[in-house]
């Protein structure tokens, strides 16, 4: 297979998406005053669905994130309620694709947690998770929900392992142990039968997740891969990374033959990470650079030249990360085909950016809104773990978004276990895993000691009072 070097010049061709343009929301429709995390981990720190926006925030003594109803735009108060149950920095958050108020988070405290957000949003700080999942020995950097199966969650840790969790029982059911360094990115194909990963060991892998077997592997020496995404049903992968000349680069791969990339294209000489986003409905690819304000977009086809440049959205405000609205949350009346939620750290701002196809008619445009994966799962955890693959359940966007009422998350009931040694419950008193957790435990113990000392002092005073009263009674028996 020969490698085709693509020109930087845009290649125009007949396309219904050649005039797509980006439109940033007005300031009153943005989310302002948010203390966005300063963590340098290469994640988006943002997740969005048709009802809520979640953003990882800067906090001391543990990790936290905000969950804001989408209609609550404008300035967010500093004391706005947070989800703050983690003992370490939160590194990734993802909404359940089938249940709008269930969100997963992972943290430096080695745990993965599942949270249930009330329908109207948070009224007070949430510290108790619906589920706490412990299985990694080091920090957990990534979480991903299975695209077609309810209650199957993947987590990748700095222990080089990927754990597959069945949330029906709250336990890990599979472990993928083929990586030799930190996992940078995970992506599923359409039916979730394949998982692709990028890793710090400079390898791109295609994995059968249930068995953990590596089907294809590429040793990317000339194209150091950072991010990867499956391109729908095309049997193609697209990676972003860095070339041997330290320029930002993308590469297109055949998922069944990773010996060489089909094409490579150099983007620019900037140093920020390139985030790829693929829309299988329109076959459009979006490339957004971390630390710059530009979003390039292309159209992908199964025939040469495979990748056709369309346009670029430019903004002077640099982005730290980007959340993406699911298809069923888009405004079809405005011919919106994609929507980003851009994190601008310097301004404490979350800015929605809509990608719009210009059309004169106000009627529903069926040619740009085909049937799309909806909010109903195609499989149960037992079916998927048993080897069944099934395409997503499709929905039409013509009727607009309707909240799913069929899928309900039920946390497994766990019997509390105890191991008592010398009167101490060892499972109740778990040793701290991080320095932040140790400090929190230390200050908590100091407060407890101070409180007990005050109680003891009050009891000493009361005891002396009673002793005096008793002495008086003995000295004056007539007063009895």
Swiss-Prot record:
Write down any Gene Ontology CC term: cytoplasm
Q: Which residues form a coiled coil?
A: 436-479
Disulfide bonds, which pairs? none
Keywords on this record? Actin-binding, Coiled coil, Cytoplasm, Cytoskeleton, Repeat, WD repeat
Q: Name one GO biological process term.
A: negative regulation of stress fiber assembly
Q: Give GO MF terms, alphabetically.
A: actin binding; talin binding; vinculin binding
What InterPro entries does this protein map onto?
Answer: Coronin, DUF1899, WD40/YVTN_repeat-like_dom_sf, WD40_repeat_CS, WD40_repeat_dom_sf, WD40_rpt
| WD repeat ranges per the UniProt record | 85-125, 135-177, 179-217, 220-263, 265-308
The listed locations are: Cytoplasm, Cytoskeleton
Q: What is its main location?
A: cytoplasm
User: What family is it from?
Assistant: Belongs to the WD repeat coronin family.
Known function: May play a role in the reorganization of neuronal actin structure.
Subunit: Binds to F-actin and to vinculin.
Indicate what this protein is called per its UniProt record.
Coronin-2B
Q: Which organism is it from?
A: Mus musculus
- Its gene name is Coro2b
């Amino acid at each position: 297979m020969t490698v085709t070097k693509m020109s930087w010049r845009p290649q125009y061709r007949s396309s219904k998406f050649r005039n797509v343009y980006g439109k940033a929301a007005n300031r009153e429709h943005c989310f302002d005053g948010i203390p966005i995390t300063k963590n340098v981990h290469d994640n988006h720190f943002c997740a969005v669905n048709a009802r809520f926006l979640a953003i990882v925030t800067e906090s001391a003594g543990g990790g936290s994130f905000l969950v804001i109803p989408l209609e609550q735009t404008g300035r967010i108060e500093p004391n706005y309620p947070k989800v703050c149950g983690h003992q370490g920095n939160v590194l990734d958050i993802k909404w359940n694709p089938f249940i709008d108020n269930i969100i997963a988070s992972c943290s430096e405290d080695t745990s993965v947690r599942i949270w249930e957000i009330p329908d109207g949003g948070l009224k007070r700080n949430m510290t108790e998770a619906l589920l706490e999942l412990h299985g990694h020995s080091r920090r957990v950097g990534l979480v991903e929900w299975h695209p077609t199966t309810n209650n199957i969650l993947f987590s990748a840790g700095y222990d080089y392992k990927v754990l597959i969790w069945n949330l029906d029982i709250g336990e890990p059911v599979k472990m993928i142990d083929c990586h030799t360094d930190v996992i940078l990115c995970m992506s599923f194909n359409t039916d979730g039968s394949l998982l692709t990963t990028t890793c710090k060991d400079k390898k791109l892998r295609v994995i059968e997740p249930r068995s953990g077997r590596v089907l294809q592997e590429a040793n990317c020496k000339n194209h150091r891969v950072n991010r990867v995404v499956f391109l729908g049903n095309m049997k193609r992968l697209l990676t972003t990374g860095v070339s041997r000349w330290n320029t930002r680069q993308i590469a297109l791969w055949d998922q069944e033959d990773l010996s060489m990339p089909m094409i490579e294209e150099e983007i620019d000489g900037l140093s920020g990470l390139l985030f790829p986003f693929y829309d299988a409905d329109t076959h459009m690819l979006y490339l957004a650079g971390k630390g710059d304000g530009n979003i390039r977009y292309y159209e992908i086809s199964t025939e040469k030249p495979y990748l056709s440049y369309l346009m670029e959205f430019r903004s002077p405000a640099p982005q730290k990360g980007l959340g993406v609205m699911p298809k069923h949350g888009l405004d079809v009346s405005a011919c919106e085909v994609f929507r980003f939620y851009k994190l601008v750290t310097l301004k404490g701002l979350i800015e929605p950016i809509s990608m719009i196809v210009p059309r004169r008619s106000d009627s529903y445009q069926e040619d740009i809104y085909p049937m799309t994966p909806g909010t109903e799962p195609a499989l149960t955890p037992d079916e998927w773990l048993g080897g069944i693959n099934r395409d997503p359940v499709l929905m039409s966007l013509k009727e607009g978004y309707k909240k799913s009422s069929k899928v309900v998350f039920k946390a497994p009931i766990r019997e509390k276990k105890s191991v008592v040694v010398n009167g101490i419950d060892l499972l109740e008193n778990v040793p701290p895993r991080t320095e932040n957790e140790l400090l929190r435990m230390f200050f908590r113990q100091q407060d407890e000691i101070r409180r007990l000392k005050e109680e003891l002092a009050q009891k000493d005073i009361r005891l002396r009072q009673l002793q005096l009263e008793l002495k008086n009674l003995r000295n004056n028996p007539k007063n009895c």
